[in-house]
């Protein structure tokens, strides 16, 4: 649900959401539609009613990313791939005559055992660690990845209906924030700021307070949004394509790049 608090937003959001439906084509789950103020509040009772004009509802999907990753690994193993968890690339190996990459040296992070593997092709799909692997081949290569940290918080389930989420496409600093029902709880997020690459990113109190403040803008004034309602919080790192002309990560387009 996209709540609308100004009449000009109705055609603005409507055109964008209908374009979303059009791109989805025959795979679209259901067509989007407009809700009156009365119906929007019936579906999302905690929504702020002051100046509310109505809401636009569109359909999207959810999936459990952790389970999906496990399913991908198991499927790959079933078709003959060797799946090596907790294994890091220590260095890339080159043919001394041609300079062509021919393999890598790996390290088991649990036992510290190291060994070499040969490869005809090396695919670097390591997300925020992309540049560290690329520079193993050539330390002079320019960076193509801008790591950005995003934080989510988990709130009690009563913060959102069991079958309806809420999206705010324009927060106080131009980002997008959402509340989504998940496993009888409510997930709210996200933040977006540049960061250093780490294996264990963690949310800051500033990140959590930002999300809570944005939530307060869209919920009824009778709802006391408390810090104590945050049941848990986590952070992840997005590997955004580096654009030197963009000062902030929230202004960087979510593009993809293939570097051969």
Task: Tell what function each PLM region has.
Residues 82-84, 231:
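General small-molecule cofactor/ligand-binding pocket signal
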Residues 34, 83, 116:
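Short aromatic/basic micro-patch
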Residues 67, 75, 132-187, 193-260:
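C-terminal catalytic lobe of FAD-dependent flavoproteins
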């Amino acid at each position: 649900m996209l709540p609308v608090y100004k009449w000009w937003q109705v055609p603005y959001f409507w055109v964008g959401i209908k374009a979303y439906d059009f791109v989805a084509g025959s795979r679209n789950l259901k067509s989007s539609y407009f809700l009156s103020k009365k119906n929007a509040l019936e579906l999302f009772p905690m929504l702020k009613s002051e100046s509310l004009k109505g809401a636009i509802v569109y359909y999207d999907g959810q999936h459990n990313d952790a389970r999906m990753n496990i399913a991908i690994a198991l499927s790959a193993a079933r078709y003959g791939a060797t799946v090596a968890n907790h294994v890091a690339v220590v260095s890339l190996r080159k043919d001394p005559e041609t300079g062509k990459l021919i393999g890598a040296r790996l390290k088991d992070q649990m036992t510290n055992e190291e060994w070499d593997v040969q490869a005809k092709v090396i695919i670097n799909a390591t997300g925020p660690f992309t540049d560290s692997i690329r520079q193993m081949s050539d330390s002079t290569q320019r960076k193509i990845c801008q790591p950005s940290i995003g934080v989510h918080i988990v709130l009690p389930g009563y913060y959102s209906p069991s079958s309806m989420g809420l999206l705010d496409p324009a927060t106080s600093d131009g980002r997008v924030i959402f509340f989504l029902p998940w496993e009888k709880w409510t997930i709210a997020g996200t933040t977006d700021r540049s960061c250093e690459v780490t294996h264990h990113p963690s949310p800051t109190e500033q990140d959590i307070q930002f999300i809570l403040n944005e939530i307060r803008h869209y919920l009824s004034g009778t709802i006391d949004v408390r810090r104590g309602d945050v049941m848990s919080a986590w952070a992840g790192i997005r590997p955004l394509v580096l654009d030197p002309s963009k000062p902030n990560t929230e202004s960087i387009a979510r593009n993809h790049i293939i570097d051969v």
